Every structure is written in C-alpha cells, then in structure tokens.
Amino acid sequence: MTLPTVAIVGRPNVGKSTLFNRIAGERISIVEDVEGVTRDRIYTSAEWLNRQFSLIDTGGIDDVDAPFMEQIKHQAGIAMTEADVIVFVVSGKEGVTDADEYVARILYKTNKPVILAVNKVDNPEMRADIYDFYSLGLGDPYPVSSVHGIGTGDVLDAIVGNLPTEVEEENPDIIRFSLIGRPNVGKSSLINAILGEDRVIASPIAGTTRDAIDTNFVDSEGQEYTMIDTAGMRKSGKVYENTEKYSIMRSMRAIDRSDVVLMVINAEEGIREYDKRIAGFAHEAGKGIIIVVNKWDTIKKDNHTVANWEADIRDQFQFLSYAPIVFVSAKTKQRLNKLPEMIKRISESQNRRISSAVLNDVIMDAIAINPTPTDKGKRLKIFYGTQVSVKPPTFVIFVNEEELMHFSYMRFLENQIRQAFGFEGTPIHLIARKRK
C-alpha cells in the first residue's frame, strides 16, 4: 500500500525539524535503529486518527553551501513534486518575512493543499500576532509550539483532513521490487538491462499521485512483477538526482513500497557509508534484500577476488547475513538473467508460513543442542512458538519470563529456524512473550 506523503517546508530556523520530530513522536511505535546503522531522519512514517502517512523534512535535504533562496526554492520544488499535502512552517516570533512571501508565491501556484503552521507561538499572548500571516494568502494559520507540543494536534487534524481519501490496494500476487543505491552506481543501466531481457513489458503505470512511474512485466512462467522506479531514475534532467540526501529520501520511499530490494553497489568504488545506511533502512523495514555488485566487468580478478569481496560485504553488512550476493554487469549482461528468479525466490521466503507443529519440533531440537540460559538461578522456559505474520516472517515464542530470553539465545533460535527452513534473503523477527 502506498502511503500519502506530507512535506514540511519553510526557511531555515523556523523549527521544521522540531515539528517533524514532534509529529513522528506521535506514532504508537517507532522501529528501533539497527545497531551500527545510522540514518538521517528526513523521512519517516507517522499516524494520526488511524491514518498513516509518510513525512518528509525538506530542510534535511538542503545543501548548506547553496544560496539562501536557492535552498528555499529547492525545498518548495521537492514538496510540490513529492507531496500530497504541504506543511509550510513560519515563525511567529519573527513575523512575515520576504523569504516567507517568496515560498508562499511558489506554493500558491500548486494545486496541493497547504497547511500554514505558525511555529514558536510559545505563550497565549503571541496568538494575536498570527493574523499577520493571512497576508500570505494560504488560508488559516495554525498557531504551534513545536518545542512544547502545543497546537500540533490541530496541524495533524488538518493534515489528515486533506489526505487523499482513497488508497488503492495493491495486488498481492504481483512482486514489487526496487533498485536502490548511491547515485551513479548503475541503477538505470541495470533497470534497462533487466527490462530488456525478453520480458513482456506492460505500459508504464502511474505509481503514485506524483511523478514516479512503475513498470510492470511478466516472466516466462507468468509471474507478474512491478519494478518501482526510484522516482525519476530513468528520466533525464532531474534537478536533484545527485543530491545524496535527496537520493536517500527517494530510496526510502521506494523501499516502503517494495517487497524485495536490490541493494546496488558500484564495484569500482566499493562500499560506502551511504550503502550501509540505506541497507539498514531496508532491513528495519523487514524487506527482502539482494546485494547486487554492479560493474563487475571492470574489476581485475584472480581466484580469490569473489571470496574477498564476499568476506568484505559480510563484514560491512553484518546485519544482512541472510542476503544473497550476486556480481553482475549491466554493460555485458553478466548474470542479469539470475535476478528475476532470485527476486521470486526471496518473495516466496517473505511469504512462507511454517506450521506450529513443525516449528516447535525445531525449537525443541534447538533446546536439546543448546539448553536455555539461566539468570540468578532462574532458567528460561520455552513453552511453544507460533508464526503470527509474513512479510517479514514473524514468530512469537511464549516463555515463562521475557527478561530471561537473552539476545544471544534469540539469535541462536533464529539461526536454527533459518537452518531448518531457509528464509533466504528475508529478515525474520522473533518476539518473546510471557505466557499468561
């Protein structure tokens, strides 16, 4: 399901990031960061009144060395391109500025709903000053104090009230995949090579309400795929295509919509921090993952090259031990024919269900190999386990005390489950729960 998108715009130092964090904090649960993985909080999911949406802090994308007005124009352009709803943040302390009027003129030309949030209204006496902002011509201003959380509920109500009313349910039989990675790792060439591999290509379809174009194709066995364009990778002339943070944001959006993610690494440049950040986001999101090393034709090789690369990848991406690695060349089409089959196989792993009886046989065998741990004389007791969901496969293990389930033993159980059932290319989640 594609979530509607809300973009926060405004000149520097009006509190965009504070409002972003305040809205993100309204979520019931926020996925924990994987240890050793950091990511810029410029894109997240939020929920209000049972409506979910994606939230973009455009200020996090700015090139700080760019001219002031260019930064603002950049933000507004992103919002107009990406968003279903725009939150325009201004400062109640400073009043209407030339920069605010400049942004308002740009936003006034869009047909997107714009919510005017007057931030830094930190006490009731300041509320009278918000009426000056009617001069921007963007409707009612909403007084907000992001720091204190005052007024954010009203802004969220306005956001939800302006979200698209219908969200199209996607066909569960279609496998959705995307190629992500740093700019210039060869994603576009890979996409074109994959789509040129004797596939039946359907007409491009609008992937969202914005400018992203998805491509459907069918393999020789009749399996349908949707390749999710990382919003503009196949188009020329995208103004911000090489802006790394912008690329991160668009990759995150593509990951959200994907079942399987192809993490593309440039063999000529090796692994960078960006690669680990994006891969960490895909892992946290529970997506199937394939590590694709492109431009393999350019590498001088000996008998140890593949093994050395694989060892380095496993060391750099320790949290992706389950992800297969494939070395390809979009230029020579080396091993490209393997990718659709790998995508299909990993999608099957994502959707695999294990019966409770078979699962518990594996758990009991695991306990026989490695008895449950003790803490202060009290031993962990596992009663039974059951699979509760797919995409990713998630298992609940019922125990006597949740605190006794050490991380290391949970990892041991995960390894035993993988050894028994495979689950290639997909994270699996194990949750310890006290039996009532």
UniProtKB/Swiss-Prot annotation:
Binding site for GTP 2: 181-188, 229-233, 294-297
Disulfide bond entries: none
Biological processes per GO annotation: ribosome biogenesis
All copies of domain EngA-type G, residue ranges: 4-167, 175-351
Binding site for GTP 1: 10-17, 57-61, 119-122
Coiled coil: none
Keywords on record: GTP-binding, Nucleotide-binding, Repeat, Ribosome biogenesis
GO function term, MF aspect, one: GTP binding
Described function: GTPase that plays an essential role in the late steps of ribosome biogenesis.
HAMAP family recorded: GTPase_Der
NCBIfam families documented for this protein: GTPase_EngA, small_GTP
Family of this protein: Belongs to the TRAFAC class TrmE-Era-EngA-EngB-Septin-like GTPase superfamily. EngA (Der) GTPase family.
Protein name (record): GTPase Der
Organism: Streptococcus thermophilus (strain ATCC BAA-250 / LMG 18311)
